[in-house]
Design a protein with these regions (language model features):
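Hydrophobic alpha-helical connector segments
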Residues: 53-90, 97, 116, 123-126
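C-terminal peripheral helix-coil segments that are non-catalytic and often amphipathic
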Residues: 111, 139-182
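Amphipathic alpha-helical interaction segments
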Residues: 38, 69, 100, 104, ...
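Alpha-helical structural segments
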Residues: 3, 7-8, 38-54, 65, ...
C-alpha cells in the first residue's frame, strides 16, 4: 500500500488499486483491512516506520538537538509526500509506529524536566508547526528541481524551532525555579 501511495499518491490508494498492484482480488484485501479508512491508517503507519524520523540516539543529544533532528526529519518526510497531508488530521487512531515516535518525543521532553501538560503542549506545538510548514512549502518545493528539493530546508524552519525552543527553555527554567523554592 505504501509503495502505491508513494508512486501515485494517497488519492489513488483504493482497495481495487492495491489488489491490482498485488495481483489479488479486492476481497483478499478485505481480509486484512475492513475499509478504506483502515487501509489508509495502515499505510500512514507504514509511512511513519519507513521514514524513521527518530533514527538518532536520544542519549547522544540534548533535548533541543534531538527534537530539532526529529522534527527536521519529519518536515523533510512530509514535504516529500504531499499527498499525505489531507489525511494527517483525519486518522482516527495512531498505529504502533506513530505511537512509538510519539512515545520517544514525550520521553525526551519528560526527561528534560517538563511536566505532563507542558510535554503535551510542546509536542502539539512542534508537530503543528512542522506539519504547517511542510504544507505551506509544497507549492514552493514543486517549483524546485529534484536536487534542490533534497537539500532545501528553509531557514524559517530553523528560526521557528529556535523560537519554540527558547519559549520551552524559559518554561523549563521557571519549573526548576519553582521546584527550588518549594
Amino acid at each position: 500500500g505504501l509503495e502505491l501511495a508513494k508512486d501515485k499518491g494517497f488519492d489513488y490508494l483504493t482497495m481495487k488499486a492495491l489488489a491490482d498492484k498485488l495481483n489479488v482480488t479486492p476481497m483478499a484485501i478485505y481480509r486484512h483491512v475492513s475499509n478504506k479508512s483502515d487501509l489508509i491508517n495502515s499505510v500512514l503507519d507504514a509511512f511513519v516506520c519507513d521514514v524513521d524520523v527518530c533514527n538518532h540516539e536520544i542519549s547522544n543529544l540534548d533535548w533541543k538537538e534531538w527534537l530539532r533532528a526529529t522534527y527536521t526529519n519529519m518536515y523533510i518526510s512530509l514535504k516529500n509526500m504531499p499527498s499525505l497531508h489531507p489525511y494527517l488530521g483525519n486518522a482516527p487512531r495512531f498505529g504502533p509506529n506513530a505511537m512509538e515516535v510519539l512515545s520517544k518525543i514525550l520521553s525526551v521532553l519528560r526527561t528534560a524536566g517538563f511536566n505532563q501538560q507542558q510535554t503535551i503542549n510542546a509536542t502539539s506545538s512542534l508537530t503543528g508547526f512542522m506539519i504547517g510548514c511542510s504544507i505551506m512549502d509544497i507549492a514552493f518545493h514543486q517549483s524546485l528541481s529534484k536536487s534542490q528539493q533534497s537539500s532545501y530546508i528553509p531557514s524559517t524552519i530553523d528560526s521557528g524551532l529556535d523560537h519554540i525552543f527558547t519559549a520551552l527553555s524559559l518554561e523549563l527554567e521557571a519549573n526548576n525555579k519553582a521546584i527550588a523554592v518549594s
